[in-house]
């Protein structure tokens, strides 16, 4: 297995108990679970039940497979993916005020962007992107759940008529204005269980 079998009751019963119950004699584990409720307890439970346990096989590859989980539990922050599109002459955008987005993506890359959105818990943009592109930041060209939308609107100047505020997906706005009537702390992101952010 890529990750140490759990030894506690969460959303499901302990995986270690099932392995013991099914009398699996040898367990090969890629990496230890950094989650505080497991953190070696699953391995110990298996050993105490007389099972042979080998830990660290293809550990680097296993950690890469579960990098979002590892980042969340070791660094106490979301796994962040940076995404941008640029033209062949290395431009990201041109000066404009018309609210029409610059299309730099092909239909295939657009689909892949929506796939990435579906794989992330939240997506973040700044004020200028919100104003100029009026993006929905939802999942349309792929299947899956749309991420929570996060907007950095320092002066709280965005129009409530933007697609970001259509109510179809939760939107969090971060501002510098004291006592702003909007969620402004990281605890709101934790409440939404945002563990993977696309920026």
Residue ranges and their predicted role:
Residues 1-61, 148, 176-177:
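Zn2+-dependent cytidine deaminase-like catalytic core
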Residues 7, 35, 130-131, 158, ...:
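Glycine-rich nucleotide phosphate-binding loop and flanking beta-alpha elements
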Residues 188-199:
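Single conserved hydrophobic/aromatic residue that forms the stacking wall/gate
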Residues 71, 79-190:
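Active-site ligand-binding patch in enzyme domains
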Residues 18, 45, 64, 68, ...:
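Alpha-helical scaffold segments in soluble metabolic enzymes
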Residues 12-13, 40, 59, 63-67, ...:
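Structural motif corresponding to alpha-helix initiation and N-cap regions
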Residues 37, 63-65, 133-135:
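Short secondary-structure boundary/hinge segments and terminal tails
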Residues 66-76:
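Flexible, polar/acidic helix-loop-strand segments at domain edges
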């Amino acid at each position: 297995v890529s990750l140490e079998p759990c030894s506690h009751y969460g959303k499901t019963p302990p995986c270690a108990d099932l392995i013991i119950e099914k009398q699996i004699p040898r367990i090969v584990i890629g990496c230890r679970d950094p989650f505080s409720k497991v953190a070696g307890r699953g391995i110990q439970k298996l050993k105490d039940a007389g099972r042979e346990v080998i830990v660290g096989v293809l550990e680097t590859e296993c950690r890469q497979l579960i990098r979002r989980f590892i980042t969340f539990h070791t660094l106490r922050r979301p796994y962040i993916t940076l995404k941008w599109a640029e033209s062949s002459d290395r431009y990201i955008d041109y000066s404009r005020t018309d609210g029409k987005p610059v299309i730099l993506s092909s239909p295939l890359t657009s689909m892949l962007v929506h796939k990435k959105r579906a794989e992330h818990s939240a997506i973040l943009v700044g004020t200028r992107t919100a104003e100029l592109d009026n993006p929905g930041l939802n999942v349309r060209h792929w299947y899956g759940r749309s991420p929570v939308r996060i907007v950095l609107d320092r002066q709280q100047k965005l129009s409530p008529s933007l697609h970001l505020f259509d109510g179809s997906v939760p939107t969090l706005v971060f501002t510098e204005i004291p006592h702003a009537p909007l969620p402004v702390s990281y605890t709101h992101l934790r409440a939404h269980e945002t563990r993977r952010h696309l920026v």
